[in-house]
Structures are given as structure tokens and as C-alpha cells.
Amino acid sequence: MIKLILGDIEPQTGTIYRADNKAVYIDQDYSLLDNKLKVYEQAQQFNGSSLQEHEIKIRLNSFLFTKDDWDKSCSALSGGERMRLLLCCLTINSKSPDIIIFDEPTNNLDIQNVEILTAAINEYQETLIVVSHDETFLEQINIERTIELRQKYSR
């Protein structure tokens, strides 16, 4: 379903009409991050609004990346750190996406990182599409509409 929404595949029947908007897909591997870059370099890559260096570092700090973390390779980050960095990068980018699609965002996150993710999502004012089995998390981010998919089992 995500690939249909993003336009990566077309439906076998019917038509999907997509508005001209910017969507960001945050998969379980955080593939928007470049593992060859260091934390600060990654944040700088998202700097479309030409924030000054100190402003980027303030944002990194607000997502719990201290000065000691700025030279750490993105490939060495834990799942929670990768999620925090990606959320930080989205706040650095001047062109906030119209839609953010999360695929199982709480997988491999500890309680502190789930709280940071929840706070960031609750501040976001645009459209969210969240694929998740974590009902507690979905309640905390005040999902307005749900689509529940169940697999049919045949015997």
C-alpha cells in the first residue's frame, strides 16, 4: 500500500490520483540517512534553508546529539539514534514535507526514543501515514483515522 501511495508502483486495476505534494517515507532501515556521513554532515545535507552552523548544532542538541556525537559515523548509530537524527534532519530542512509515511516507527526504539518520536510527531502539523502494530504509540499520537488490515487464513 505504501508503494502505491508513493507512486512506486501502479495499481493493477483502477486509478490513483495524487496531489502535487512532497512525501517523505521513513522506512524501518532509515534509508534516507547516508551511512558514509558523520552525524553533523548528515544534518548539513538537509540544510536547505542555509541555517548557520551553530543553529544546526542547537537542533542536533535538542535531539540529544551532543558535541561528542557530531563526528560519529551514521553507520554506528543505534536504531533510536538513527530515528532521532532523521527527525532532526526533517526540522533542519526548510521544505517540510506535506506527508510523512512511517513504517513501524517504534521498532527497536527504547522508551526515551519513543517519547522523542511521539513529541516530534505531535508537533508535526501536516499529514501522517503510520503503519504500526504498536497500539499504545498510535493512541499517543492521536491518530484520527485508522485502516486495519487483517490477513485471511485458509485451511
Where are these regions (language model features)?
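ABC ATP-binding cassette signature C-motif
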Residues: 1-155
